[in-house]
Swiss-Prot record:
It comes from Parabacteroides distasonis (strain ATCC 8503 / DSM 20701 / CIP 104284 / JCM 5825 / NCTC 11152). The keyword Flavoprotein does not apply. GO terms for biological process: ribosomal small subunit biogenesis; rRNA processing. An accessory protein needed during the final step in the assembly of 30S ribosomal subunit, possibly for assembly of the head region. Essential for efficient processing of 16S rRNA. May be needed both before and after RbfA during the maturation of 16S rRNA. It has affinity for free ribosomal 30S subunits but not for 70S ribosomes. GO terms for molecular function: ribosome binding. PANTHER family: RIBOSOME MATURATION FACTOR RIMM. This is Ribosome maturation factor RimM. Residues 98-170 form the PRC barrel domain. It comes from the Bacteria. Belongs to the RimM family. GO terms for cellular component: cytoplasm; ribosome. It is found in: Cytoplasm.
C-alpha cells in the first residue's frame, strides 16, 4: 500500500481531452520526462492508487496531456477530473527533487529555523505577489516566509520538513 509520505504532489487533473481517455494534467513538474516506466498516484476512495502512464505530451508549459493505462474513453477519464496527482519520491533522485516540486507541494511540511528552532507547519502558499510566500502557522499566528531557495538550508521530503535560515527580525514582523 502506498503511503502519503512516499509521494509528492505534482499537479491536478483538470478535464478529459478528446474521446480516447486522455486527461489534462495541470503541473509545473517535468518528472514524467525522465521516467523510464512512469506512473502517477491518485487518491481513490481514500486510498492512494498507482496508475501507469501509457503516453504523455505537452499541450502548454503547464498542461500535459496524459493517457493512463486502461483509461480508454472520455467516460473513464471523467472519474479523474479534479483529482490531485502525486508522484513517488523513490522514482526521483533526491538532488533533483526540489527543482521539480511546485511550492504547493510543501503544504503540510513543518518548518524549523536553524537559530529559532521549530516555527510551525506550512498551511498555504501565496502566489499572488511577485515573491511567493509560504504561510506558516506559527503559534496560532500567520508567519509569511519568502519561498526562495537561498533561505532553505535543507528539505527532507520523507519527513516532510524544511530547515530554513531566516534573516534576523523576519519572524518578529
Amino acid at each position: 500500500m502506498i503511503r502519503e509520505e512516499e509521494v509528492f504532489k505534482i499537479g491536478q487533473f483538470a478535464k478529459p481531452h478528446g474521446i480516447k481517455g486522455e486527461l489534462s494534467l495541470v503541473t509545473n513538474s517535468d518528472v514524467l520526462e525522465d521516467a523510464e516506466d512512469p506512473y502517477i498516484v491518485c487518491e481513490m476512495d481514500g486510498i492512494l492508487v498507482p496508475f501507469f502512464v501509457e503516453d504523455f505530451r505537452y499541450k502548454t508549459d503547464t498542461v500535459v496531456l496524459v493517457k493512463l493505462e486502461d483509461v480508454n474513453s472520455e467516460e473513464d477519464a471523467r472519474m479523474f477530473v479534479g483529482k490531485e496527482v502525486f508522484y513517488p519520491l523513490d522514482a526521483v533522485d533526491e538532488e533533483d527533487l526540489v527543482g521539480d516540486m511546485t511550492w504547493d507541494s510543501f503544504i503540510g511540511y513543518t518548518v524549523t529555523d536553524v537559530q529559532k528552532g521549530y516555527l510551525g507547519e506550512i498551511t498555504d502558499v501565496d502566489e499572488t505577489t511577485i515573491n511567493v510566500l509560504l504561510r506558516v502557522d506559527h503559534k496560532g499566528e500567520e508567519l509569511l516566509i519568502p519561498a526562495v531557495e537561498e533561505l532553505i538550508t535543507e528539505a527532507d521530503h520523507e519527513a516532510r520538513s524544511l530547515t530554513v535560515s531566516l534573516p534576523e527580525g523576519l519572524i518578529d514582523l
